Design a protein with these regions (language model features):
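Alpha-helical transmembrane segments and their helix-start/interface "positive-inside/aromatic belt" motifs
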Residues: 8-18
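Ordered, amphipathic secondary-structure segments that act as subunit-interaction surfaces
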Residues: 74-117
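Active-site and channel-lining beta-strand-loop segments
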Residues: 29-59, 153-162
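Conserved small/polar residues in nucleotide/adenosyl-binding loops
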Residues: 215-222
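Alpha-helical transmembrane segments
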Residues: 53-64, 123-139
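Membrane-helix boundary/juxtamembrane motif in polytopic membrane proteins
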Residues: 153-177
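Select subsegments of transmembrane alpha-helices in polytopic membrane proteins
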Residues: 92-97, 171-179
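Membrane-water interface of transmembrane alpha-helices
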Residues: 67-77, 139-154
């Protein structure tokens, strides 16, 4: 009886997250049904609509977040993660679910109002898009160093998976790099917004991602 109570208590948060994301999905579908038949589904660097399509193209942003909650429930039931990894996993998956849902509503509320090619979204989208992405890198960067070696969460290369020392050093360095990436992305978004530029945010993001991939890619000796 005590074990059953402990299990139900442990999965209560993922269940609440699942219920919230499912409710969000239902509301998103309702608003999609109420949207115009043709809306902006792609923007150029100046946030001018360059492609129109069905508002149902926004649907993935509403149906994907529940899978994060399902993943948490699955991990809690099977106890696949080390105790030190469970809190980072919960925080990272929760933030990803919230970020994807937020992007869905951003597209639906602001971008969904744009119905003509060349029309610009009337919103500070550099701040609304790039600042949350910067926050994601900061949060994940703070938790990278505390993640212990495992096969599902973290930076997985042959060398990191083979050694606790290499794993710890890689995640310690990349944690700092991701925090710098996040801060830089937020500052770049502010620069693009107030300096009226159109490339700093995405240029910084692309360069940061490429740099991370190059750093974590296996070397020939791995």
């Amino acid at each position: 009886m005590k074990k059953k109570f402990f299990l139900s208590k442990k999965i209560s948060y993922p269940v609440v997250l699942l219920a919230a994301t499912l409710l969000n999905a239902v509301l998103g579908i309702v608003f999609i049904c109420l949207s115009p038949d043709r809306v902006a589904v792609h923007f150029n660097a100046a946030f001018e609509a360059d492609k129109l399509g069905s508002p149902w193209m926004y649907l993935p942003a509403f149906v994907l977040p529940p899978f994060a909650a399902v993943g948490l429930i699955f991990e809690n039931v099977r106890k696949g993660q080390k105790p030190q990894n469970r809190k980072p996993l919960k925080i990272i998956l929760t933030f990803i679910a919230v970020l994807i849902g937020y992007m869905g509503w951003l597209m639906l509320v602001w971008c969904g109002k744009v119905s003509e090619i060349g029309q610009k979204a009337e919103a500070p989208l550099y701040i609304l898009v790039c600042v949350p992405m910067g926050m994601m890198f900061i949060i994940m960067g703070n938790y990278l160093p505390v993640i212990k070696r495992n096969g599902t969460l973290g930076i997985k290369t042959p060398s990191t998976l083979a050694s606790d020392y290499v794993w710890a050093q890689t995640h310690r360095v990349m944690g700092k790099v991701w925090v710098v990436m996040g801060i830089g992305e937020i500052l770049a978004a502010l620069a693009d917004t107030f300096a009226k530029t159109e490339f700093i945010s995405f240029g910084w993001l692309a360069a940061s991602i490429v740099g991370c991939l190059l750093y974590t890619s296996p070397s020939p000796r791995d």
